[in-house]
Amino acid sequence: MAKYSSKINKIRTFALSLVFVGFLIMYIGVFFKESIWLSTFFMLLGVLSIGLSTVVYFWIGMLSTKAVRVVCPGCEKETKVLGRVDMCMHCREPLTLDPGLEGKEFDESYNRKKS
């Protein structure tokens, strides 16, 4: 079985990685001290990456406030569900709000709209 995690945690992990990538890009800019334009380019690119992570964190925070809160039957802790199927943030139990999907194997494709 593939390794799944909750959607909120995936997006938060992406935003955190943008912060570290931004710092790495700015660190690369330090090696180009002789060229002011190249150094400035890398510094601005790093700041842009960190700024983008702030936007992503804000977006997932707003999305998180609208998520449905449920109590996980596996660990008895409160967790948030985005979409039709999601994973528990604590124990990674598959969760669904759709009665038609109860008992079925977990698949993230259930959240995609059919064309």
Curated annotation (Swiss-Prot):
**Native organism taxonomy:** Bacteria, Bacillati, Bacillota, Bacilli, Bacillales
Judging by the UniProt lineage, the source's domain of life is Bacteria
Is Protein biosynthesis tagged as a keyword?
no
Q: Which residues cross the membrane?
A: 13-33, 41-61
- Belongs to which family? Belongs to the UPF0295 family.
Chief subcellular site? membrane
| Official protein name in the record | UPF0295 protein BPUM_0828
Q: Name one GO cellular component term.
A: plasma membrane
Q: Quote the InterPro entries the UniProt record gives.
A: UPF0295
Tell me where it resides: Cell membrane
